[in-house]
Amino acid sequence: PEVFIYDHLPSDTRWQLLKKPVTSEDYAGFVRLRPAFFQTGLEIKSHRKGIIEIDDQVIVTLRAPDRAVLMAELLRDEDKLDESYTFIQRQNGSYNIHAITPRAGPYVLRVFSKNRHEEGSYAWALDYRIKAAKGGGGGFPKAFGTFSENGGYLHSPMHAKLKRGSTQVFKIQVPGAEKVAVIMGDNWHHLKKEGDMFIGNIEIQDKHIRVFAKFPGQEQYDGLLVYTGS
């Protein structure tokens, strides 16, 4: 019932089968879901309303089965913005969809989904209308496919641009990885392994900052994330 109420509002509240019936006013404000949302087994977890008012950042959380994979984009005036303004990662049976706005104003956060082993492109699943009070001044780091394919989860740092001379706390969860290193030029800074978590305080010394991981049975490291020193 909690899923179907987004798609259809019974005129008789008894047929909603909900502990707290939804009013017509509530229903009018719900996020509008498209067929792909239901076809990939998604559920709303964090934001039921279709309009989200924020300062400059938001995290939308959707429950999703293991078979579902997501993409997201941020639009302004129907124009797609740079992919660095969204960042998706999976944890505990849900996807966290991070979005940051470059400046104040209205935006659309659009989410696409597909079943993992299905051929074809991602399908439009839902839209949120975002009202931002200000801009966040930069996007998220670039994530390689290896990051999501191995269940990676980035705790920090979340901003793509890191100030040179600053010390940043790198905290990255990479299930199954043997080693994770932050690479700047020829310098490799290996993070401390604590279970699936890799943690370390790293001084930013270069313009090009990459995070790589080594997995069992591999001699070479695979790329996970890319940052920029500014």
List each language-model region with its residue ranges.
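Aromatic sugar-binding surface patches on proteins
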Residues: 84-97, 188-200
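Short beta-strand elements
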Residues: 115-148, 216-230
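Short, flexible loop/turn segments at beta-strand junctions in immunoglobulin-like
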Residues: 99-102, 200-204
